Structure formats: structure tokens, C-alpha cells
Regions:
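NAD(P)H dinucleotide-binding glycine-rich loop of Rossmann-like/cofactor-binding domains
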Residues: 88-177
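Histidine-centered active-site/metal-ligand motif
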Residues: 39, 58, 169
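Glycine-rich beta-strand-centered segment in the early N-terminal region that forms part
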Residues: 21-35, 45-95, 100, 147-151
């Protein structure tokens, strides 16, 4: 499949052929329909924040194409939007309604000794925020997805994952509006 890969800091993104694994456990394979370019993606591309090579893109929306055997929150055919919150769903903070303060966000990723979700020529690619939406498909933990109405346009849905929640969080939690 094609993905927009950042190979080194300060370089341009490049369209490349990459491999994507089959979904395991609580992973969901999403056919990406829209992905926004956020300023955070540009910061990742120009500052030493995340490893390269990487597939960024955290404002992502698409259609569920396949699910791992333990997935319970989405079904094939659902329209979904990705979330920045990498939350395990089982720690005290997640269970008290604070998934953004999850104590075990690594639970949404594959273990280092597992095969990578994304790879190129056998080498794993970093998946920005566990999403990697700058690709034709993305393999994402179910806790990082929210189902949206099928009538919602994908371009608008993609904005929900970062821009809208960031703005709403500032208005509701900081400005107390």
C-alpha cells in the first residue's frame, strides 16, 4: 500500500510502498478516507520528537475493513475517526473518565518483540500517535477509534480527532464556558 513516509527530520514526506500487518487482538484495520495535516505533524517532521522513518497523520477518518479477534467496540463497515488518546481502558485514570492521563498507553501498541504494524523492506515504521493516517490504510487499537454517523463527510470527521477536541477542551476545561 502507499503511505506518506517521513524518512528523516527536516526532509519532505515521500510517497512509498509499505507493508501493513493483519489486525491482531484489539487492532482495527481502517481504509483511510481522509486525513488532515495538523501543525503537530509538521512539528514531528522538523523537531526531534519522534523516531524516523515514520508515518504520521493523527487526524484520520475511514471505514473499518477488518478487526482483530478481541475487538468489541467497532464492526466491519463502521465509519470511524481516530483519537490522539492512547488509553488502555483499564487503569484507574481511564476508569475514572481521564483516558488522556492513562497510566498504560503502551497497551494500545504492539510490544517491541512483536512484528510491527507498518514496515518497509522488513524494517518497522513509527506510527505517529499510534494512528499513522497518512496512508491508504491504518492499523489502530480499538480504544483510539470512535464510530461516527455514516452521513458525516470524512473530511469533517477527520477534524474531530484533534482540532475539534483540542478546541473544545480549551473552551470547556480552561475557559469554563
Amino acid at each position: 500500500m502507499k503511505a506518506l513516509v517521513l524518512n528523516a527530520l527536516g526532509r519532505r514526506f515521500e510517497f512509498e510502498d509499505v507493508e501493513i500487518a493483519s489486525p491482531e487482538g484489539r487492532e482495527v484495520l481502517v481504509d483511510v478516507q481522509a486525513s488532515g495535516l495538523c501543525h503537530t505533524d509538521l512539528l514531528f517532521a522538523t523537531h526531534d520528537i519522534a523516531p524516523t522513518p515514520s508515518v504520521l497523520g493523527h487526524e484520520v477518518a475511514g471505514i473499518v475493513a477488518a478487526i482483530g479477534h478481541d475487538v468489541t467496540q467497532v464492526r466491519v463497515g463502521d465509519h470511524v475517526v481516530g483519537s490522539l488518546a492512547q488509553a488502555c481502558g483499564g487503569c484507574a485514570r481511564c476508569l475514572s473518565g481521564r483516558p488522556f492521563q492513562c497510566q498504560h498507553p503502551e497497551a494500545t501498541l504492539r510490544r517491541p518483540d512483536d512484528a510491527p504494524r507498518l514496515s518497509r523492506d522488513g524494517t518497522g515504521l513509527f506510527q505517529g500517535f499510534g494512528l499513522g493516517g497518512f496512508a491508504e490504510r491504518a492499523l489502530i487499537h480499538e480504544n483510539q477509534l470512535a464510530v461516527v454517523p455514516k452521513a458525516m463527510p470524512f473530511a469533517q470527521a477527520a477534524l474531530l480527532g484533534c482540532g475539534v477536541v483540542t478546541g473544545a477542551g480549551a473552551v470547556l476545561n480552561t475557559a469554563n464556558v
